């Protein structure tokens, strides 16, 4: 992170009204970015603050059901127009196109890759297809039978975020599997942010992760970054 506030919000949870305001209004304004450009990062998939649970909670808050928005349910997941989604496997055959401001295709190609993120632009029940607009401007049409290649991406694992950067990241600080609650995971999450890191939850969990060096030390600057976050001289 280059310049930004780092905020440990006491014992607040992601369902807290103030926390929701931070995610939907304060952070986007602070980093001059759309809320869809922010990213919640969590160590695990299966826990009270794992990816699956957080995506359900944040979808309900940031993109709730609306009579004007089409939906498609796949297994336990509801995909809704306006949802943030991620491609979860490499698919070299998926065709894409980029459009000009008049909606006319000006560039075409194929290949969508693991980790690509975008927003659901359209769900067409008649054609049984979902159109996703990816961050780089590509439009991709998925048949309903291909939706197992997508998942909601309001929250993703820290591992999945490696190699990516975001204007701001939100990191829930709650107890999880000890093997995942370590300094390396914390470092990876913190350094995904270009401007701002917001930590929500229990400050003691932050301390536990900072002190858990069970994995090989790989980052010489981590101590300095942790002190910066904690405002320690």
Identify the meaning behind each predicted range:
Residues 2-5, 25-28, 157, 184-186:
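A generic local structural motif
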Residues 19-127, 233:
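Accessory interdomain/linker segments of ATP-dependent helicases and helicase-like nucleic-acid enzymes
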Residues 11-12, 80-83, 164, 203-205:
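Conserved helicase motor core of SF1/SF2 NTP-dependent helicases
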Residues 107-110, 114-233:
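C-terminal accessory regions
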Residues 5-6, 74, 107, 156:
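A structural connector/turn signal
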Residues 1, 67-69, 180:
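Short gly/ser/thr-rich secondary-structure transition/capping motifs
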Residues 11-12, 16, 47-48, 72, ...:
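Hydrophobic alpha-helical scaffolding
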Residues 1-14, 18:
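Single conserved hydrophobic/aromatic residue that forms the stacking wall/gate
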């Amino acid at each position: 992170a280059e310049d930004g506030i780092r905020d440990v919000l006491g014992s607040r949870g992601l369902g807290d009204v103030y926390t929701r305001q931070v995610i939907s209004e304060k952070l986007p304004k602070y980093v001059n970015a759309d809320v869809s450009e922010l990213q919640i990062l969590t160590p695990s998939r299966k826990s009270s603050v794992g990816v699956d649970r957080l995506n359900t909670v944040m979808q309900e808050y940031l993109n709730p059901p609306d009579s004007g928005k089409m939906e498609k349910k796949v297994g336990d997941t509801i995909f809704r127009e306006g949802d943030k989604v991620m491609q979860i496997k490499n698919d070299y055959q998926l065709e894409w196109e980029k459009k000009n401001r008049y909606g006319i295709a000006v560039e075409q190609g194929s290949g969508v890759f693991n980790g690509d993120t975008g927003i659901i632009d359209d769900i067409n029940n008649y054609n049984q297809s979902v159109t996703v607009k990816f961050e780089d401007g590509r439009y991709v049409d998925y048949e309903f039978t291909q939706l197992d290649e997508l998942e909601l991406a309001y929250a993703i694992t820290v591992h999945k975020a490696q190699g990516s950067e975001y204007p701001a990241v939100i990191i829930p600080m709650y107890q999880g599997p000890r093997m995942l609650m370590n300094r390396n995971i914390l470092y990876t999450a913190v350094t995904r942010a270009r401007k701002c890191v917001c930590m929500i939850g229990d400050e003691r969990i932050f301390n536990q992760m900072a002190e858990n060096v069970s994995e090989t030390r790989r980052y010489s600057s981590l101590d300095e970054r942790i002190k910066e976050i904690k405002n320690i001289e």
